[in-house]
Amino acid sequence: MLDARKNSILGYLGLNNKSDLIISVGLIFVVAGFILPLPAVILDVLITVNLVISLLIILIVLYSKRSLDFSVFPTLLLVMTIFGLVLNISSTRLILTKGINFDGQMIRTFGTFVVGSSGIQGLVIGFIIFIIIIAVQFIVITKGATRVAEVAARFALDALPGKQMAIDSAYSSGNLTEEEATRQKNDLQSEVNFYGAMDGASKFVSGNVKVGFLITLINILGGLLVGITLQGLNFNEALNNYVSLTVGDGLVSQLPSLLISTSTGLIVTRSISKNSFGGEIFDQFTNHLGIYWIVSGFLLFLAFLPGFPTLILMFLSLSIAFLAYSLSGIRQKEEIDKKMKLEEEQASIYSDKDVSPVVPLDPLALEIGYNLVPIVDDTKTSELLDRIVKIRREIAFEFGIVVPKIRIVDNMRLEPNAYSFKLRGVEVGRGEIKLGKFLVINVGIDSGIDGDLVKDPSFGLPSLWVNDDGRETAEKLGYTVVDPPSIIATHMTELIKRHSYEILTRQDVQNTLDVFKKDYGAIVEEVLKNFSVGEIQRVLQGLLKEQVSIRNLVTIFETIADFTSITKDIFFLIEKCRQSVGRQITSGYLDLNSELNVITLNPSFEQMIIDSRVESNHDLISSIDPNLKTKFIYELFKIVNEVQAEGFYPVVLSSESSRPIIKVITSREIPDLVVMSVLEVPQNIKVNVLKTVEVEE
């Protein structure tokens, strides 16, 4: 926005893309002023420019709502300091060389008219004014601004880690978008850099004040020396000419310096606000209108005391009373308008035109009871919020999907220690936490550890809630012990993995295609020629539903493209994509010897499963006899438990045709069962058959 405004102004002046050139040329001329003598007319112009720029600077500071709105200020301080020194050197050269014939109007005017008197009296008055300005600048404004800049720089740097963590927490909880978080971090870094620069730049201001005073003293002595010894003037003539011009030069150079010093003090003491400095003054001075009536009454009281200026005090008293009356009327009008607006808003709640059937739901949300609010408190370091950031990153790396923002809200309807994880407004998992305690996972009944017996919310394993003493005992016995944030984070991770296929939307697929197209345009073009985004989404969802990562999109899209001319059967394409990433799938279930231990099915029963396949456009079901299905589930469940008891991970290996039907049949009773087809196993992997499921017809 600022760049557009700058370009429009420069474009109007015919100086597009030449701002840097203009500043560079200006700085060269400034440096040249150290060497080249300037005519009095040019000196008057430059003195006026110095005064105008200083006035612009203080006005910009007053109208800025925050320090970063004028972030170039520290650099500008250095430039203006150099510019002022150049003017001092040039004016000194002209005064000493021209003497009586010096015709610089700005310096002569400040030496006579501004002082208000001429002769020796004017010199004394001018020098006193000069000393007062120097004292105010150095002792009051500059010293205070320097100290404030030092403290602000230190505090800004100390607060940086905490503010960055607060931004990360707000982003991970869904209160900030990625763009907003990035912008706030950039603003935070800019703020630290600004106050760090101001800490050093404030030294320019104090140094400039000291140098200004020193230059004036040197000019007075030098002027008297040149006038008396070189030009033959007596002391009074030299005093009237050289000292008068030197005082005028000192005043005309210290006025811009005073404005810049004041600007420095203002900008380092400003806090972030919605209004400018003037707006803040007005708002805060009108918060308490009763004080104006008190001041008015006090002035009226003073007006009747002997010796006080009665008319002036009465005029001021009436003016302040009128101001208080006017502000009261404005305040009453604002309150009436505010009340009417509130009534309109309340009425609009019941208005049909504001009722919309489309209410956006959070893709993912974690709702917590009020006792769990401290573990997500972003005013201090929150382990859970940090974990959420890591969860999103890890799942993106493991499964190849972008997990949307997880919004964290407190829900008074939940039990105080409960939490609920929701997917688009529907609960997919919940648990209960005991703050101050730890959960010992997978303990036996006779473990010898005292605690409350519960089930682990993530995997359903028998667990115990224990205190610190029980934690130490459990760790010595070799049990896994986790704290409350870890419990919630682990549960959320498993729920997101389990429902990753539901999280993936068409828009996510389209965004992936847009990014993927930049490097693999040929594949994307070939796939989109025959498949819609929705069909591609269904293939990817079919893979995610069985915990198959879709990070290897190149292989997956190439597989889809290979079969575009053969079929558009989604279930067939899912199987072919599984086979194309078979090495990836198999690697997750190999034992320490890189061998695959599996459970197989009786061939005749497997054929029955294949024959029971019923396929529609959007679903795949089995028409197998319910009694046979029950027997099969029973036998399979028994074998799975036996295999697990022997220390193996249960994996069912079947043919390509039966694999998806077996998964459909077992998805409700054994949802986490891994079912692979023979074609998914690489040829160099040794397969060991542990058990075979036999089902009697």
Swiss-Prot record:
UniProt keyword annotations, A-Z: Bacterial flagellum biogenesis, Bacterial flagellum protein export, Cell membrane, Membrane, Protein transport, Transmembrane, Transmembrane helix, Transport
Location in the cell: Cell membrane
Transmembrane region(s): 22-42, 43-63, 70-90, 122-142, 211-231, 247-267, 277-297, 298-318, 355-375
Coiled coil: none
Similarity-based family: Belongs to the FHIPEP (flagella/HR/invasion proteins export pore) family.
One GO cellular component term noted in the UniProt record for this chain: plasma membrane
Disulphide-bonded residues: none
Name this polypeptide is given: Flagellar biosynthesis protein FlhA
PROSITE patterns (UniProt xref): FHIPEP
Keyword Transmembrane: yes
Protein purpose: Required for formation of the rod structure of the flagellar apparatus. Together with FliI and FliH, may constitute the export apparatus of flagellin.
Signal sequence, renumbered to the chain: none
NCBIfam families found in the cross-reference section: FlhA (TIGR01398)
Lipid bilayer topology: Multi-pass membrane protein
Primary location recorded for the protein, binned into one broad class: membrane
GO BP annotation list: bacterial-type flagellum assembly; protein secretion
